[in-house]
UniProtKB/Swiss-Prot annotation:
This is Palmitoyltransferase ZDHHC5. Residues 388-398, 445-478, 667-678 have a biased composition (Polar residues). Residues 1-13, 74-148, 213-714 are cytoplasmic. It comes from the Eukaryota. It is an enzyme of class 2 (transferase). Coiled coil: none annotated. Phosphorylation regulates association with endocytic proteins and its subcellular localization. Phosphorylation by LYN during fatty acid uptake leads to inactivation of the activity. Autopalmitoylated. Palmitoylation of the C-terminal tail regulates stimulation-dependent plasma membrane motility. Keywords: Acyltransferase, Cell membrane, Immunity, Innate immunity, Lipid transport, Lipoprotein, Membrane, Methylation, Palmitate, Phosphoprotein, Transferase, Transmembrane, Transmembrane helix, Transport. It comes from Bos taurus (Bovine). Residues 359-373, 422-432 have a biased composition (Low complexity). It is a multi-pass membrane protein.
Amino acid sequence: MPAESAKRFKPSKYVPVSAAAIFLVGATTLFFAFTCPGLSLSVSPAVPVYNAVVFLFVLANFSMATFMDPGVFPRAEEDEDKEDDFRAPLYKTVEIKGIQVRMKWCATCRFYRPPRCSHCSVCDNCVEEFDHHCPWVNNCIGRRNYRYFFLFLLSLTAHITGVFGFGLLYVLYHMEELSGVRTAVTMAVMCVAGLFFIPVAGLTGFHVVLVARGRTTNEQVTGKFRGGVNPFTNGCCNNVSRVLCSSPAPRYLGRPKKEKTIVIRPPFLRPEVSDGQITVKIMDNGIQGELRRTKSKGSLEVTESQSADAEPPPPPKPDLSRYTGLRTHLSLATNEESSLLGKDSPPTPTMYKYRPGYSSSSASAAMPHSSSAKLSRGDSLKEPPSIAESSRQPSYRSEPSLEPESFRSPTLGKGFPFDPLSSGSRSSSLKSAQGTGFELGPLQSIRSEGTTSTSYKSLANQTRNGSLSYDSLLTPSDSPDFESVQAGPEPEPPLGYTSPFLSARLAQQREAERHPRLAPGGPAPREPSPVRYDNLSRHIVASLQEREKLLRQSPPPGREEEPGLGDSGVQCTPGSGHAPRTSSSSDDSKRSPLGKTPLARPVAPRFGKPDGLRGRGLASPEPGLPAPYLGRSVSYSSQKAPPGVPETEEVALQPLLTPKDEVQLKTAYSKSNGQPKSIGSAPPGPGQPPLSSPTRGGVKKVSGVGGTTYEISV
């Protein structure tokens, strides 16, 4: 048997109460059996009735005092105990009716005992208004059962008095029968009643005094208010009425608890991210937009865990089983997908690492750099009100510009500085692999990129992939939807604007228009790339413009420019189907001597003009002579020509150009960005001389602002 159960069922605890019950019930039974019948005949029949009523009252109060809860306080639970430190003071003082009363800390129940409360060592509980522990009733006497205990004492005293008195009366009436059984039993009951009368009567008198004074047995024995004022007394009559007539005190143990279920969602808990659609509302540069994108929980956690210094992971391959709606779109770009997915895409810049890659449609939003650059160009077909407004209102995905509007450069696209020299070789290798995928239909005639509606917005749409990749910068408009727009009427280009970027498809179309069809065995002439002056200051550009005006005022009487060669906004990319592009720094070109052959150190011009506009430098071949065959370029693969054009074997034509020739090429395209007139918007008329035709093979030095000297071949 457990120790707690053994302690609860100790026989010694029940000996006093059992003896009291036996003596009470036994003596009364003998009284009613042997004494009451003679008294009812000799004295009055009311005697047994009176004794029966008193006895029942005694039994009722005895039962209530024994089995009733005295007012036990429940023990504090562990979580409540944590609020009070073990180093807390042993006593706390409260004021009751202007008198300081101490409350002692109960180490067993773990709370400060209220006033007049004490811990019972027998019951091991704190009892409200603890009086004493009575072994005769085997219970503590407290606030809730003190009334019944007090009435039990009063009724028991009266009952003992009645039993003893009515027994003595019976003996007096039957003096002749003292040897009889009835008289002998009556005398025995009288002895028992007399024995219990003295202590019970004394205890009853003591509690009568306590009730009249408003004290408890514990307070009286311990001398709590000895020599002082009792703050709990309300007068004799009020104290008696409070004990006998007040409403019963509430019970603290075993109260039915109504459990209420309350769902609490603290603000610091984030909701679970499901694999559904997440609506993202962003606000950048004053433009608001709501985008929907399917993004899994795992991808969000990876993005949040990455630091700003860590390198971004390579873009994932598209999951065709999950994005079933993309299969039809992916069939249009099978060739470039197969060539690009096998290679590592260029790393994403750090400032765009945490930008989610959104696109114009929800279906193609989860594609990596290459596929999303080809499948999500629908927004690029929407024409802005004007180029000037589009330059003042950058794309809502672009990085916000911190420059005031009055100090911004007139050139467009400066929000993303891009150096075509350092990244030319890498982007060229990627674009040449994609070249065959671009030829989906007959090439249309396009005069300038500024004449289409995709001038600036198409470039800004490339940043929706979340990064400025090489493909998105070099191919701003290579979607199938873009081709359908090209067949329509071409509006006049706005003045002072030429896009610094041109797609590989546009370059292919312009190359097909510029050059006549070559023989199958003939080498393909090289088309240089246009010049970007985004990084030059305004003063340098102004000096170059003045030199350009001088060149236009003195056109040569010799070669006339063909109608299709007046476009200066052409950027010859490796995917254009002609000469491959290999970039080299300006320092390398300056260090290379003229005596080195192209085979020993091939130096390709980074910028240039069409063949009709290119001046004859020291190392440039004659127009009529075929270019020397220098071997196939290692970085690029051959591709098919447009329909109707015989296939030509692509060779690397890399003539030597001195730094002077480079300056000449830069001068020819000095007005490509932000100038009053665009020299590449339309071909010149039949009577108009070419804009930048060279006059002679000499070189002139022009001094610019800041002491900079430019060598321009004229």
